[in-house]
Swiss-Prot record:
A biological-process GO annotation: isopentenyl diphosphate biosynthetic process, methylerythritol 4-phosphate pathway
Site (Positions MEP for the nucleophilic attack): 158, 212
Protein name: 2-C-methyl-D-erythritol 4-phosphate cytidylyltransferase
Reactions the enzyme catalyzes: 2-C-methyl-D-erythritol 4-phosphate + CTP + H(+) = 4-CDP-2-C-methyl-D-erythritol + diphosphate
Gene name per UniProt: ispD
GO terms of molecular function: 2-C-methyl-D-erythritol 4-phosphate cytidylyltransferase activity
Site (Transition state stabilizer): 17, 24
Species, as recorded: Neisseria meningitidis serogroup A / serotype 4A (strain DSM 15465 / Z2491)
UniProt key word Disulfide bond: no
Length: 229
């Protein structure tokens, strides 16, 4: 039986660092919100079977997304943290039968709206049949420094360092088990939760264009990337 690929987009955050008057996933770039650009990536990809967006129960912007993408599931069961939001989304996928434990869940940041389709294809092809799952990532290019107050305390050896991106692809059952802990402190992405089970996910070559909209100045770069598509 074919294993499904389900995109899960946690979009319950408020994006405080971005400094807008609304969550950054609802900031408009061009004629669409950031979240709409992100959803479109998965809806256009032939290997993705379903897209699910998990928002906050108090979300007042999601109706526009549902109108733009009536086939996408928009669930208002987000948690206080990203990990809780993903956990709630995966649990509902399993409870409703929309996902089997062996199906692939591709968790993707709502604010990464420039993911190239070829990077998504590469992740599915290389990690889609891997029991340990895998993530998009790129080797660290810059020299990294440790800080002590306002001074450099050490230079970090970067040879084996990779910068994690999304999507992060794992079987639904594995992801559900990895996020089942009552205390999810320190879990900043899905791979870190899976690693706590003693599993070593694959690193799949990502793409520098797959940046995360975090600071206000990032919007300029994102706009250029979207215009180039």
């Amino acid at each position: 039986m074919k294993r499904k690929n389900i995109a899960l987009i946690p979009a319950a955050g408020i994006g405080a660092r971005f400094g807008a008057d609304k969550p950054k996933q609802y900031v408009e770039i061009g004629s669409k919100t950031v979240l709409e650009h992100t959803i479109g990536i998965f809806e256009r990809h032939e290997a993705v079977d379903l897209t699910v967006v998990v928002v906050s129960p108090e979300d007042t912007f999601a109706d526009k997304v549902q109108t733009a993408f009536p086939q996408v599931r928009v669930w208002k069961n987000g948690g206080q943290t990203r990990a809780e939001t993903v956990r709630n989304g995966v649990a509902k996928l399993l409870e409703t039968g929309l996902a089997a434990e062996t199906d692939n869940i591709l968790v993707h940041d709502a604010a990464r709206c420039c993911l190239p389709s070829e990077a998504l294809t590469r992740l599915i092809e290389q990690a889609g049949n891997a029991a340990e799952g895998g993530i998009l990532a790129i080797p660290v290019a810059d020299t990294l420094k440790c800080a002590d107050g306002g001074n450099i305390s050490a230079t970090v050896e970067r040879t084996s360092l990779w910068q994690a991106q999304t999507p992060q692809l794992f079987r639904a059952g594995l992801l559900h088990r990895a996020l089942a802990a009552e205390n999810l402190d320190g879990i900043t992405d899905e791979a870190s939760a899976v690693e706590k089970l003693g599993i070593r996910p694959l690193l799949v070559q990502g793409d520098a264009r797959n940046l995360k909209l975090t600071q206000p100045q990032d919007a300029y770069i994102v706009r250029l990337l979207l215009d180039a598509v």
